[in-house]
Amino acid sequence: MSSRKGTRSSRIVTLERSANSSLSNNGGGDDSFGSTLLETSRLQEKDHLTSLNSRLATYIDKVRQLEQENNRLQVQIRDIEVVEKKEKSNLADRFEAEKARLRRALDSAQDELAKYRIEYDAAKVEVKKLKPQVEKLERELAGAEEQALHAQSIADQSQAKQKTLQARNDKLVVENDDLKKQNITLRDTVEGLKKAVEDETLLRTAANNKIKALEEDLAFALQQHKGELEEVRHKRQVDMTTYAKQINDEYQSKLQDQIEEMRAQFKNNLHQNKTAFEDAYKNKLNAARERQEEAVSEAIHLRARVRDLETSSSGNASLIERLRSELDTLKRSFQEKLDDKDARIAELNQEIERMMSEFHDLLDVKIQLDAELKTYQALLEGEEERLNLTQEAPQNTSVHHVSFSSGGASAQRGVKRRRVVDVNGEDQDIDYLNRRSKLNKETVGPVGIDEVDEEGKWVRVANNSEEEQSIGGYKLVVKAGNKEASFQFSSRMKLAPHASATVWSADAGAVHHPPEVYVMKKQQWPIGDNPSARLEDSEGDTVSSITVEFSESSDPSDPADRCSIM
């Protein structure tokens, strides 16, 4: 399983390699034992071999049973891996499809939102543009309404006055006939008076001017001719009296004519002004009513337009809120699904860890049984060699089990040294050769190799930091035996915090989906002896590596004696 505990980590996997080497120490024998010792030794060997054969058969059956159980567990593990990969693939496909659908829906919603925002901005601009006109029209409408109310009040007053005047008119119709006659007379009189007034005014002006001139002349004459004035004073008084009387008589007659004429003209002007005022008032009232109706209709239209724009704006806002609510709901739903998937994956990983632990335990048991079988094989080969039943037997047998992802360590197992005594009195000391493999993992920096598949299908690189890391130009190299394969990331490749990128072999059947999944072209990760993997940065420096080291040691203890089955 993967581990993310620091920037520099080291993981060691220890595996036993068992081999048998015989170190023989010759003991002294005495030829005096004779045939009795030989027969006794052969009987003991027969009983011992019978017991060993029985135990060997039991161990063979147990080994076969464990191999069958191992095969069954491997089949179960492969089935679980297939189901997990299928579920991951299906879940990833469904997630990508749903993600694409949501992205399309989000793009559509954003397009509609942009369109609605444009319409809303245009509507706001139009509303701002129309708002002064509406306010002006409302003011004009208020003024028109006030004028209409004032005109209505005036009209009501006029109607009341009209009724009163109509009543009075009926009463005055009779008087009108008399007044018409008097009007004609008075009109003539007014005309005469007007003319008289005009003439009298002219005469008065002329007289005043003349009087002033005469007064000036008189003053001058008085100053120069005081004496003559006294002489002609009496005569001048008579002349002035006569002249004043004549002027007064003319003035009185002309004034009366002018007054009559002015009265007639005033009445005519009054009637004309009244008629013109009523016509102008009616025309203005009709025009005001028409403007009022137009202003009311335009105000109603503008208010309806404003209401439509406000309704459209509120509808767009509600649509945006609804889309945001749906998007939040979908995000929460997918987050819950992702949490459920992560929980399921964690459960599967725990199950896999448990099964792998059981598998390793069974593997340890198998190794112990292999060691026990090797021990008994050595004993049987010693007897066969002693009895000259075979000439040669293999001395060392080693079984390699190397895995990149092994997480624990298998301890050495051994007990007391076994000693075999042959018929010649020679004893054999058996030492066991232990071979260990050590898996070292080193990481410098936040990015490193996280895990390597045992079957050589994929290699995972992970970012263990809280920040985004660029791995553009990084090169991943895996070696096993004489084989080597490499993969280089693109120059724009970046890893999100705690994210990983998995590089699959070309024949693994994975789908290329950057930046999480990469599939190599015509290359496979190698499998073989002495496997190693390293991650190089863009400058060629190694930032993470995994290597396997082997070590051998001899141990006189027998691993089989610690077998729980024994």
Curated annotation (Swiss-Prot):
Region (Coil 1B): 95-228
Positions of post-translational Cysteine methyl ester modification: 563
Annotated spans, Linker 1: 83-94
Disulphide connectivity of cysteines: none
Region (Linker 2): 229-256
Gene that specifies this protein: lmn-1
Protein name as it appears in the record: Lamin-1
GO molecular function, one term: structural constituent of cytoskeleton
Species, as recorded: Caenorhabditis elegans
